[in-house]
């Protein structure tokens, strides 16, 4: 089947909304391959950041965490690999690959890697 859709990549500003142009524009890629685990660390990579929000990949080593905090906007967390615990307003949720949770704006939340854990965080303003 012939693809009649034509997309001119040269018409796209390759750095618009993409930090450091490290992520392909109009090309497929694997989210889990774009962020690697580091011993004793939380690694994050911003995929998109602009005035309307941001999309960030995270890789947590086992036992690592993001301490309790609030955010001014709703966010959705999607688990890409491993198992993590998300605590929202004191309530604990264990999430595994393929599961997601919405964290409401201005509500205290934290993330803990119960084992090595990769997630995609999308925050929309």
Label the model's feature ranges.
Residues 90-105:
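Short acidic-glycine-tyrosine-enriched beta hairpin
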Residues 40-42, 51-71:
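Conserved short histidine dyad/triad with adjacent acidic residue
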Residues 54, 83-85, 92, 108, ...:
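Structural motif
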Residues 80-81, 96-97, 115:
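A cytosolic small-molecule/anion-sensing beta-strand core signal
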Residues 105-125:
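Ligand-binding loop in jelly-roll beta-barrel domains
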């Amino acid at each position: 089947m012939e693809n009649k859709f034509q997309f001119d990549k040269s018409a796209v500003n390759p750095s618009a909304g993409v930090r450091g142009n490290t992520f392909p524009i109009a090309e497929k890629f694997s989210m889990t391959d774009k962020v690697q685990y580091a011993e004793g660390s939380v690694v994050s990579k911003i995929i998109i950041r602009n005035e309307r929000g941001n999309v960030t990949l995270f890789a947590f080593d086992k036992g690592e965490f993001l301490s309790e905090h609030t955010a001014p906007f709703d966010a959705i967390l999607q688990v890409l690999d491993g198992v993590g615990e998300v605590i929202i307003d004191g309530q604990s949720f264990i999430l595994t690959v393929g599961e997601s949770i919405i964290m409401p704006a201005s509500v205290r939340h934290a993330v803990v890697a119960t084992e090595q854990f990769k997630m995609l965080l999308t925050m929309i303003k």
